[in-house]
Swiss-Prot record:
It comes from the Bacteria. Residues 182-195 have a biased composition (Polar residues). Monomer. The gene is infC. One of its GO terms (cellular component) is cytosol. It is found in: Cytoplasm. Pfam families: IF3_C, IF3_N. SUPFAM superfamilies: Translation initiation factor IF3, C-terminal domain, Translation initiation factor IF3, N-terminal domain. Transmembrane segments: none annotated. This is Translation initiation factor IF-3. It comes from Porphyromonas gingivalis (strain ATCC 33277 / DSM 20709 / CIP 103683 / JCM 12257 / NCTC 11834 / 2561).
Amino acid sequence: MAIDKTKNQHRINEAIRVKEVRLVGDNVEQGVYNIQEARRIAESQDLDLVEISPNADPPVCRVTDYQKFVYQLKKKAKEQKAKSVKIVIKEIRFGPQTDDHDYNFKLKHAKEFLQEGSKVKAYVFFRGRSILFKEQGEVLLLRFANDLEDFARVEQMPILEGKRMTIMLTPKSASKKGHTPPKTQVEASKQANESAETEEEKKRCHPTKPVL
């Protein structure tokens, strides 16, 4: 196959300028060949000679269809990218004197972040002399972790860094398609539905007789 593109990622055919190569590929007797013989073998099968390991001694070349070879490389790279997990960390800030309304508001958002598969980094920021209440900040963060125990596990316990006391939470299970409730809530809902269906079935099979 007459393809000679020197600007490609891999050198092919006439662009391979070495004396000998190690040949691999289907329907090829693997071994070391001089470059002219390797090209002749590729041409006899109407395929390309593709250099896949230029730093080997001698360089390794594959007898293959170059277009299909590139397609498979791109496909593999795309699959690997899809499998790679992108870790997202959401930050939630508290003050040492956070009231219940603000706390519950941030707790709700933390649940949403965890259900989406994101980690949550919650911290208490101490201004000036409020650092004297660092124990109060630790209690707040531990309460926060306890209220999220159905959604997350503690990756890092509260630690004081400068004016911040931080805790790191990681999701127990990620649901990127929606906000899936905890398993216990799902099971409870299922049991309630089954119970209601059973009662309805009993009523159909044993109708209540009117009182005379």
